[in-house]
């Protein structure tokens, strides 16, 4: 079953979004990092204090862009050296200011909770988790 996007990166007004989420994986992370429009969206979101979230291998992109300098962060095991300037925690999910990083797919619920906590509120995130009957 094909998935159809309702909007493409060419049609996004970055002033209208709360931030960006980089899903990671391989070769997904390499494809994201090779796309200049994705990198522009990440940099713009960071500069404007919007949410910048990355999971699995994708935090490496933030490291390469210098976004993690002085920030606590985590990533999929084996990508730690790519988190340039970061204080690597090794925990499942880390929120440092507007930056959220997570280790991998097994941390997706926690990662989503962190995103909703910043985008809406911790109470809203807790309600979503409660309604899903997890964590």
Residue ranges and their predicted role:
Residues 1-3:
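Charged, often glycine-rich, active-site loop that binds/positions anionic groups
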Residues 5-135:
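Active-site-adjacent pocket-lining segments in enzyme domains
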């Amino acid at each position: 079953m094909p998935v159809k996007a309702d909007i493409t990166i060419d049609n996004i007004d970055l002033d209208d979004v709360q931030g960006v989420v980089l899903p990671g994986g391989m070769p997904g992370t390499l494809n994201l990092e090779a796309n200049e429009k994705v990198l522009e969206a990440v940099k713009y979101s960071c500069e404007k204090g919007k949410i910048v979230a990355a999971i699995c291998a994708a935090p490496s992109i933030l490291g390469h862009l210098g976004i993690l300098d002085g920030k606590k962060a985590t990533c999929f095991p084996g990508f730690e050296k790519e988190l340039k300037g970061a204080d690597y925690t090794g925990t499942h999910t880390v929120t440092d200011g507007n930056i959220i990083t997570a280790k991998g797919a097994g941390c997706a619920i926690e990662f989503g909770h962190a995103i909703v906590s910043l985008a809406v509120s911790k109470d809203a995130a807790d309600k979503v988790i409660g309604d899903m009957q997890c964590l």
